[in-house]
């Protein structure tokens, strides 16, 4: 009986690994395009938290820059859109990539949709979740170069004070996380998981990429 159980467990574990790992992304178009500069437009926010758009947007520059791309400064991009009468993320996403190229001179556009963002109370824990999906499009011809998604869930209850203490701690943590926008901190991890060239099916290394030297 024991060998049978162990064998079944091994099969289930193997099946789980096969389900969880996404197939390798086809980077043919990405390699042909060779983008050097990326314009990140304000993300669409499908979550109920109004901080979703700017929390995720503020987290994207670091991983993209470290990946070797020039990223247009968010403040400059926002002001340029305002001068062109565009202040809503949905309206900006509707602008043709070629038009954005005429305005900014960028090689590619990164479109992000935030599907989950914020902190929720779950029985004995307060959980902050950030989930997003993204598409990188060649702004010179509108061709999709890459797409991916990432989701991070982070709990904040490390209390050993029993059931009542855990309940109180979860409520307090949810309030504190909401006031300090814990989602922004978690979105940094989500952005790296989504955009880092070291992630499975992440964005390829750009022309300015510098390999970190071992110490």
Swiss-Prot record:
This is Putative lipoprotein NMB1124/NMB1162. Gene3D superfamilies: ABC-type transport auxiliary lipoprotein component. It is a lipid-anchor. It comes from the Bacteria. Present in outer membrane vesicle formulations which are used as vaccines in human. Keywords: Cell membrane, Lipoprotein, Membrane, Palmitate, Signal. A lipid is attached at residue 17 (S-diacylglycerol cysteine). It is found in: Cell membrane. One of its GO terms (cellular component) is plasma membrane.
């Amino acid at each position: 009986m024991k060998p049978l159980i162990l064998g079944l467990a091994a099969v289930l574990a193997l099946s789980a690994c096969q389900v969880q790992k996404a197939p390798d992304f086809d980077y043919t178009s990405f390699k042909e395009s060779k983008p050097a500069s990326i314009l990140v437009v304000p993300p669409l926010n499908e979550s109920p938290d109004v901080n979703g758009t700017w929390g995720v947007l503020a987290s994207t520059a670091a991983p993209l820059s470290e990946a070797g791309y020039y990223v247009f400064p968010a403040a400059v991009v926002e002001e340029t859109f305002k001068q062109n009468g565009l202040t809503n993320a949905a309206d900006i996403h509707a602008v043709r990539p070629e038009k954005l190229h005429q305005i900014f001179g960028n090689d590619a556009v990164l479109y992000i949709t935030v599907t989950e963002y914020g902190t929720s109370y779950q029985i004995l824990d307060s959980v902050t979740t950030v989930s997003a999906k993204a598409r990188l499009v060649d702004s010179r011809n509108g061709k999709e170069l890459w797409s991916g998604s990432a989701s991070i869930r982070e709990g904040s209850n490390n209390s050993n004070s029993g059931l009542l203490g855990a309940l109180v701690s979860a409520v307090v943590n949810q309030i504190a996380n909401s006031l300090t926008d814990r989602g922004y901190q978690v979105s940094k991890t989500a952005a790296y998981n989504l955009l880092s060239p070291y992630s499975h099916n992440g964005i390829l290394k750009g022309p300015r990429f510098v390999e970190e030297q071992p110490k």
